[in-house]
Amino acid sequence: MDTNLAYAMAKIMKIRNVGDYSRYVGHTDRHPLVSVIDYAEVSPVRHSLNNYSVYGIFFHDEAEIDLAYGCGKYDYKKGTVICVAPGQIGGKEDNGEQVMLTGWALLFHPDLLHATHLEKAIKNYSFFDYRVNEALHMTDEEHDIFVLLMRQIRDELQKRPDELQNAIIVGYIELMLNFCQRFYNRQFITRKLENSDILMKFDSLLRDYYEEKTQLTLGIPTVQYCADKLCMSPNYFGDMIKKTTGDTASNYIRQY
């Protein structure tokens, strides 16, 4: 194995279950499949670059963290939400530094969703496949809603387990995901100027593609191809085009 590759792999922490992350930050779980962490109670914490086998929703209130991702750098600031899904890698490599954080993290294992409506429905929340530089920036009101839901899930976890506990927790998680989708919809609307600029770059990309006759060798450009050229994830790019034009990115390409 390449030495640099082996070193990079050694720096990635595998989060196979919620307990792996909780133990790293010094949090004690009350449930094997779901964890709610108030960072104010465990700080200071070290950075970690994680390979997730669980779902995670993270937001911080104060800390500013530079994360390298994709085509540039991203400043993780107050009121920013990042969602991760199993199979994804995210975070910042441990460099020995300890940081004071205030904010919350919700992690839950896919097994928690087994035989529930959310088991299949979670695939509809495309923001789990957004890049970190496409994160949600919350308003103060949206932030308060997220904190309230985090506390409600935590309160439920502190109760004596019964046959309805998992269903109630999954219900809260689905409610949080729906609010997250609503907040993203608001963000797409409030970023009309930025989205218009991306749309112009999209048009320019398609124009150059056909003027250079690239379609003769590669065929019709795909959403993945266009998103990569614009340094965006396919899901965020597709959602942005849909919100901006009312049409899907694939239809927009075909009709160009």
For each feature predicted by the language model, list its residue ranges:
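Short acidic-glycine-tyrosine-enriched beta hairpin
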Residues: 71-85
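Histidine-centered metal-chelating micro-motifs
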Residues: 82, 87-93, 113-114
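A hydrophobic/aromatic-rich effector-binding and dimerization subdomain
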Residues: 95-159
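An amphipathic alpha-helical interaction segment
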Residues: 144-204
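Short helix->loop/beta-hairpin flanking segments within DNA-binding domains
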Residues: 204-219
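Basic/polar phosphate-binding segments, predominantly the helix-turn-helix DNA-binding elements
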Residues: 208, 220-256
